[in-house]
A protein has these predicted regions:
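Catalytic machinery of carbohydrate-active enzymes
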Residues: 1-251
Length: 251
């Protein structure tokens, strides 16, 4: 792999201004030729300043805050589709002389994941339609009411041509899933059954994913699966839709 990660201990040795200077020294020792700031917050601005003073080319993301503020303000909203975050990241690299072709389709290329790897857990697909449902998100404002989502689960569970897979994690989400699985025996909870790699494999074999504005929307997008995304406190115009997802599939 040509990607490596360097952790920032922001509550320990990299805490505060003194800690940022320590982090800068550690990063500078790597002798980077360029610095691309995809975050553009106070800490990264300071680090970029230090690199710039050391004559290392730096480029930072432009987040388009003005357009987003007009989109979310209470009155006189301006509902204009903002540039996607993917395009903004590519713009940063282009500033440094590395133009990016945004032609990615799937981590599996034109194929899907190895079905034999997940079949012991999922069973054979046969002629069934496989629907993934990811009903939760990190922030409550993004979650469609659970009792209403259960109605969706019940609807598809009653269809003998459909198999529903529930995606989530954590104790509270598992309690909800366990309740649904008990009521609807054809529904399968995937919590604790697959790791991240094999869960992506399963997603590649879905016919569609129903998700909030959450990580699962983006994971399904990585394997080129259509996502019906439900937006609550956020808006698909803000530039955070899943990769190559269609606006017509947003709710």
């Amino acid at each position: 792999a040509n990607v490596s990660f360097i952790g920032a201990d922001l509550t320990g040795k990299h805490k505060g201004l003194w800690g940022l200077n320590t982090l800068y020294s550690e990063l500078k020792a790597k002798r980077f030729d360029y610095v691309a700031d995809f975050h553009h917050v106070l800490r990264t601005k300071y680090l970029c300043l230090r690199f710039w003073l050391a004559n290392i080319p730096v480029a930072s993301i432009y987040k388009g805050r003005v357009g987003k503020e007009k989109l979310v303000r209470r009155r006189h909203k301006v509902l204009e589709n903002q540039k996607s975050s993917f395009r903004r990241y590519a713009d940063v690299l282009e500033k440094l002389g590395f133009p990016v072709l945004l032609n990615f389709s799937s981590i599996y290329g034109d194929e899907k994941g190895n079905f034999a790897e997940i079949e012991p857990v999922t069973g054979a697909k046969d002629n069934l339609k496989w629907i993934g449902i990811a009903p939760f998100a990190k922030h409550m404002g993004k979650i469609y009411p659970i009792e209403l989502q259960e109605q969706v689960v019940a609807h598809f569970a009653a269809d003998p041509k459909v198999k529903v897979f529930l995606f989530g994690g954590g104790k509270s989400e598992q309690e909800v899933f366990d309740g649904w699985v008990a009521k609807y025996p054809t529904v399968v909870s995937m919590i604790g059954k697959l790791n991240m790699r094999t869960e992506l494999n399963l997603m590649s074999h879905l016919d569609v994913m129903l998700s909030m504005d959450s990580a699962n929307m983006h994971l399904a997008s990585l394997v080129n699966i259509p996502v019906i995304s439900v937006w609550g406190a956020t808006h698909p115009y803000a530039g955070f839709m899943g990769w190559k997802q269609l606006p017509v599939n947003t709710v």
